[in-house]
A protein has these predicted regions:
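Membrane-interface "cap" regions at the ends of multi-pass membrane proteins
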Residues: 58-61, 65-68, 72-141, 156, ...
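Selective recognition of specific alpha-helical transmembrane segments in multi-pass small-molecule
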Residues: 124-126, 150-158, 192-204, 268-284, ...
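Transmembrane alpha-helical segments of multi-pass small-molecule transport proteins
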Residues: 190, 217-254, 269-278, 312-327, ...
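Membrane-interface loop-to-helix entry segments
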Residues: 192, 203, 209, 240-284, ...
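Hydrophobic alpha-helical segments and their helix-loop junctions in multi-pass secondary transporters
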Residues: 205, 209-218, 270-297, 319, ...
């Protein structure tokens, strides 16, 4: 009995598709198994085409199948990418699994996670001591807290602008920078930012080690003298505590981002509660807020206040200037733009200001209780006579410092090093390298001056990071209108140059303008405005050097899917 015409046509179509499948399988059997393209699960991306050799033949066959207008096409895009995953259309010099775009299963961070991230990062000893450095420079407590609030509100703008790329495209900061600096040129801003983060890692690790040392001393009174000898002005047990805390950081690094998210979820509220209890203790023991809240600033006029306010404000921006660049490292795990934006807007300025206020209150009370203002909370708690209180307080400091150190000072440089040397360095190895560099920078010397890290450390590097932020924002929002071809960010011969010299030149000009005041006394005011100067110069010069016509467009042969 003859088959109906439509059935016969369907059978014939099925036979043709089966023959095409056989050809593809034969080709794939001759291909060396390779890692899948990093964006194969991402929606809205295009299929890269490679016309060379076996890969090109297979790619063209698959594209032919996909564009077939028959009612029952060969397969969906995910199936096609399952086949293409044997071909590696990306470059091994630009890709490893830690740099790959996140897939939907990895996007688990919501509003609370981003808010908790900032709360936990803000609750650290350097934040606690920010107001002390500003008050020491002559500000009143109100002026100091106002400067902190304003600085964190300003830096929130570039943070949100750069965060957008992480959530939209699922890419980390080093890959995001490839659009503006080139696929290999992106190593320049990535390594600049990484070195700053390494310095911060060392600072936080030393503070955490000191807290751990006091904790051990509270539970074991003979701890300080348990091991004789000293080095560099510090006892052997201090060095052991430092290395133990450093090791805790390494453990979290090797456990990955999911462990970080879990730690942040409970560490953030725990730190808030413990700090509030410390405020209650201080007010109860001092019978009042103390002399610092009552004293006025040393500046009698705006003319006297301005020369201190400007570099102080710039330093406050510099405090989180590192995160203004690499927030895509975190927002790539976000479920939506709305959730990541709300979490950051709510948490950053308020938490920084509230925690700094707590530091002012506690320190003010210490002036009454102990006869002098003690700005270092580790030193303050070390004076307590109740071992239980000391142990709980130091445990809080250790948890807070560990949380902020991993989130703020390990994630980005680890990705940066992996971006520069993807064949050799994974995220875990990059984190370990960050730890070693942090030790080599000798953080115990950086912390020798209690206010030096504000006017030397923060102010100094802010000019360089502001210059990078200017280029990234100009490229992503003005030239490219937030559109990126993600797969080409992982290819050497894609639409993005290997070295985009306009981005590098604009960054160097921004750095030069921001730092020239260090060598030319007449131009010292430029250094006081370092972040603003670096950002403005790099932003404007990048747009002058570039034009919309210089931005390569995706190939018309590219296929987009939903």
């Amino acid at each position: 009995m003859p088959l109906p015409r439509q059935v016969a046509e369907d059978v014939n179509d099925a036979r043709q598709r089966a023959a095409k499948r056989t050809k593809i399988i034969d080709i794939l059997r001759r291909c060396r198994p390779m890692e899948p393209w990093p964006g194969h699960r991402q929606s809205g991306q295009s299929i890269p085409q490679d016309d060379s050799g076996v890969k090109g033949i297979a790619s063209r066959l698959i594209l032919t199948l996909h564009t077939n207008q028959a009612p029952n096409r060969f397969a969906s895009i995910p199936v096609l990418w399952g086949i293409l995953s044997w071909m590696r259309p990306h470059s091994s010099r630009l890709y490893n699994k830690d740099l790959a775009p996140t897939n939907p299963e990895q996007r688990t961070w919501g509003t609370y996670n981003f808010a908790a991230l900032w709360v936990s990062m803000a609750h650290c000893i350097p934040t606690y001591m920010l107001a002390s450095g500003l008050i020491g420079a002559g500000m009143s407590w109100g002026q100091a807290l106002g400067t902190i609030l304003l600085g964190n509100t300003i830096v929130l703008v570039p943070i949100l602008l750069n965060s957008h790329a992480g959530t939209k495209h699922g890419i980390p900061f080093p890959v995001f920078a490839r659009a503006a600096y080139g696929t290999f040129g992106s190593n320049v801003p990535a390594l600049m930012r990484a070195l700053v983060a390494c310095g911060w890692f060392g600072i936080q690790a030393w503070i955490g080690g000191q807290a751990l040392h006091v904790f051990f001393r509270s539970v074991w009174p003979g701890w300080a003298a348990a091991i004789p000898g000293s080095f560099g002005g510090h006892t052997a047990t201090e060095w052991i505590s430092f290395l133990l805390f450093w090791g805790l950081n390494v453990i979290v690094i090797y456990r990955g981002m999911d462990l970080l998210r879990k730690v942040e979820n409970w560490a953030a509220p725990f730190v808030l509660v413990m700090t509030a209890l410390l405020v209650w203790w201080a007010l109860d023991r001092a019978n009042g807020l103390g002399p610092i809240l009552a004293q006025k600033g040393k500046f009698g006029s705006w003319r006297e206040f301005w020369p201190v306010f400007v570099p102080s404000l710039t330093a406050m921006i510099g405090f989180w200037a590192t995160l203004s660049l690499n927030m895509p490292d975190f927002t790539r795990f976000g479920r939506s733009q709305r959730e990541q934006a709300i979490g950051q807007i709510v948490a950053l300025p308020t938490t920084m200001t509230v925690f700094a206020t707590m530091g002012v209150i506690i320190t003010s009370a210490s002036a009454i209780i102990y006869g002098k203002a003690i700005w270092d909370p580790v030193e303050l708690v070390g004076k307590f006579t109740e071992p239980v209180i000391v142990a709980i307080s130091m445990f809080t400091v250790v948890v807070a410092t560990l949380s902020v150190n991993i989130a703020a000072n390990v994630v980005s440089p680890a990705n940066d090093f992996a971006n520069a040397f993807p064949r050799l360095i994974t995220f875990s190895r990059g984190g370990l390298l960050t730890g070693f560099i942090g030790i080599a920078l000798q953080p115990w010397k950086l912390l020798a001056d209690p206010s030096g890290y504000i006017f030397d450390w923060l102010l100094g590097y802010s000019g360089g990071l502001g210059s990078i932020a200017g280029v990234l924002i100009a490229d992503y929002w003005i030239l490219r209108r937030s559109e990126l071809v993600v797969e080409d960010l992982y290819r050497e011969e894609g639409i993005y140059e290997r070295w985009r010299w306009t981005g590098i030149a604009a960054t160097l000009l921004g750095c030069s303008a921001a730092w020239i005041g260090l060598v030319v006394p007449l131009l010292r005011p430029l250094y006081d405005y370092a972040w603003f100067v670096g950002f403005a110069v790099s932003f404007s010069t990048y747009l002058i050097f570039s034009s919309p016509l210089s931005v390569k467009k995706p190939s018309t042969a590219t296929i987009y899917h939903s």
